[in-house]
Amino acid sequence: MELKVFKDTIAAYGGRWETRLELPVETEILIPDYLPAVFKIVKCLMEPVVLQNRVSGGRWHTEGYLRCTVYYQSDEPGCRLYRTEQKFAFEKSVELPAGSYAEGPAQVWGEPEYCNCRAVSEHRIDLRGAYILCGAVLATKECELLTSLADCGIEQRTRELTGLQRVAAEEKTLTAETTLPLPEAAESVLDINGNFVLGAVSLQTGQASVQGTLQVQVCCQPADTEELLVRQREVSVQQTVELPGAAEDDMAVAWGEVMACTLTAAEGTGEADLNITWKLHLEVWHTAARTVVADAYSTVCQTQAVQTACKLLNKTADLTGRVSVVLEDDLPDPDVAVKGCFVTLGSAIPQTREEKDTEEEIRLCGKGTAHVFCADARGELTCYDKNFLWQPEGIWPGTKADACTCLGASMARITSSKTGAKLRVELEIETTGILLQATAHEALCEVELGEEYAEGSDGPALYLYYARDGERVFDIAKRYHARAKDLVTANHMETDGKAPQDLTTETACLLIPAAL
């Protein structure tokens, strides 16, 4: 008689492949003649704008530009601040190590490595620096597992494996438009940024519908004041995205980011047209369940079983909410006045929590920098940088290698002030997404039968076994090559609708009928 073996292949979690790419910058920024000449450079910022981000055919391809923004002062009296920027294009293609990877966008984040900026003339700025762009690609592993066995006196214990598989992922660049009151003639627009607040996301077969709000903040300096003011405008957006492979009962994760904004005067209306370019991130996860063989033996033959570990992702936490950060520090000069603050925000990534005498735990941690603009009595502006860490609430058991985040974060509120010589910055960070963690499950991938057991007519027909509380009936029967159902019947055990292989015992003396 031949053993019948049934197998199935499961797409399991294979880890995250990460890399760091250096984006060098060496350029000159020319100040247009219609802008005042450079007297002092106050701050230079570098920020990546990713236009293409795709994993396909064993390669990760990304392209976009670094937005290099320079804030400077002219030699005119007062705390007037001016802004100029230049885009520095980049394109990178990285060959992934041998393996299987999820198609679609990679997770991208980064931070400036260094930035040196100086004025070489009144209308020319020399910029040299580098930005570290990080990418993480989701790897998959094909696990071939046994799903059922039959004949040859085989006894098997099955279990159900449940996990999430990413079936679709998309990044789509979109535009939205609104109007604002036209800035005054001498008013300087220093920055336009914003964030996306998710309202609702729903799935249909092959597509997703997303509703939300774009909150745009326009930072400007009016002609009659030296303070930096912020005007806000909200724009409701609704978008349908084609997602082949998505189904109604899948789980969708969506977040957005504002990439660029353009403010142009509308002729004859007294208003300005605000064009917003933003990116929508969408991921669809499908819950897959498989019944596999966790253990097996034969009552008539020697059995060699091979186990393997299969890692599956499951949702651990919902990360949607707001994170508050309060920064306090002594100002280098107690007499300066705080004029305003910009924030550079980094992504929150899994980090190992360093605590002694405890099991390994992780938390999410991101970096950021508050750029605080201060003015002295002469009207000269200086930027003080205050680095900070921000953390979504929660600590989870596990390892960094088994954690996977689908998370978007953006600034929702910035407030800066001083009391005496003490600086205070209050931040609110809007987060949307989930945390996934992989759990290893043991299952059989191969079973081989050996020689048949010797005839047991001369051996005992019945054994006594003193079972401990919580022992599995299947494991006891396996020790004696007996059938689990015979053991349950002989000891009049209550099954409560469970299969004999799944029952556990109390502390008792059990009768083990020989199966040979």
PLM region spans:
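Surface-exposed, interaction-prone regions with an acidic/low-complexity signature
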Residues: 444-466, 503-516
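Membrane-lipid interaction segments
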Residues: 2-451, 456-459
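Gram-positive cell-envelope targeting signals
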Residues: 1-3, 115, 310, 497-498, ...
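Short alpha-helical segments in extracytoplasmic peptidoglycan/chitin-binding modules
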Residues: 467, 473-489
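A structural signal for short secondary-structure junctions
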Residues: 421, 458, 468-469, 480
